[in-house]
Amino acid sequence: MVFMALGLVFTIQNVCSGQSKIDYTNIHPLRWMDPYRNPITYQEYTSSREFAPGLDARLIYTGNKGNVNICIIINASLQLQIQTKFSVFLADLQADGYNPNVYTANNDGDEGALKNLLISEWNSRQIVGTIMIGDLAVPWYEMNEPESWGGAHVEFPIDLYFMDLDGLWTDADSDGMYDDHQDGVGDMEADIWMGRLLAMNLTYHGATERALMDNYFDKNHRYRTGDLRLQDKALAYIDNDWCIYGWEYEVAMAYPQTDPVIDVYQTNREDYMQRVRQSTDNQYENLLICSHSSPWAHYLYWGTGPYDYSLFYNYEIEEIDVQVLFYNLFACSNSRYVEDDDMGDWYIFQTTYGLISLGSSKTGSMLCFYDYYTPLGNGANFGEAFLSWCIDDIETCAGDESRAWFYGMTLLGDPTLKLSRFLPDPTGDVNRDGIIDINDVVYLVNYLYKGGPVPDPLRLGDVTEDCTVNVSDVLFLINYLFKSGPPPGVGCA
């Protein structure tokens, strides 16, 4: 199979042969870069919170329209605020074949009680995944980094705890943080996928948790129905320390059109902003960014000097309207969701774009990318692709340093989403290129008045949902594209 990207020919053979030569125990590690702030500790986190007296988990909805069982747990008070948009999300999930049990719960600080609920669902209904929404208990892990990394003691949230339902997690010093993970009644592999939606600690731009959640579910629905689509291509933006490894070829296993940016004199703040901002309109559906970072900024090299950094900040995501839907953040602690205004969450809760970010809550990120991008490119949803990667790589990819690299990995967003090429063509995308634009108007005009080809299927041109394709559909599409009119309907012609 041949992939094309920027005039380069990518072949599966080249990708695989290149991988065999990479020593993942010798990859330049990511670093915490912020000189003024340190990661919040477990003690600081717990002492700053007021926990509920109990979990009080209540089953409020049982789906019966799908055949793939999942479990959704949502903060009880948040559910009351967002139930209108959340109900649309549930309908979308069931239309895609999922059968959700929905529970409301409180954050009582007891991650074990939350996990027991998942274990019960796994044993009784064989759930394949879970989505946690809002303020819920967070599991923490502690470890010493490898000596080659400096040997520091680190504490971090670990969502793998909720994915492995039959392993053994122990807290030898009884300080509230797990410090070991082994086989239990079953193995220590991840058993289910997990996604987390948490917006309560995002504070910029007048943000409120309710508004951010409502907007996220609105974006989610628009993506599923075809109203929010970008082009079927990816950007691999790889800074100096990792530009030699060919990771852009691994992204190409999901996106045949992958644009690599790996020149050490090119990867910097200004160039990154120019490529991803909406006004440039590159329309990348997916982004891999590899950059030394903190939860609040990317530290991109400026040239080749060891300390010549140019920073892209969390608050700028909204300001420049970053035009990407799906992120892989090879960026130290960028998804440390216990910190206020972490970038992993801002990338998905920005107003216009953003649906999923995959990143780490600690120093480290993903390696062995091909085990993630290959299933994505074969039609798996993001949760399935992440679960597959966890099973294959989380304990082994980097040898003895694997836990240091990977135990902070977390998926923020809705894991049931897939790449747009695996979704139905949206009504209005008459030429079936994945986006609705002026070219579709031209296509309809040519069909109606110049003997051009018939839309296939015809419903793609029936944007007014009157079961015919005529000049009204042309006018409707123009109004939608250029006058902020309503989006196209489903179509029935």
Explain the meaning of each model-derived region.
Residues 2-13:
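Bacterial N-terminal signal peptides
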Residues 3-4, 404, 456:
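Residue-level detector of transmembrane insertion/anchoring sites
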Residues 13-14, 466:
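Serine/threonine-rich, low-complexity intrinsically disordered segments
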Residues 18-422:
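Cysteine-dependent hydrolase recognition
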Residues 422-493:
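Cellulosome-associated attachment modules in secreted, modular CAZymes
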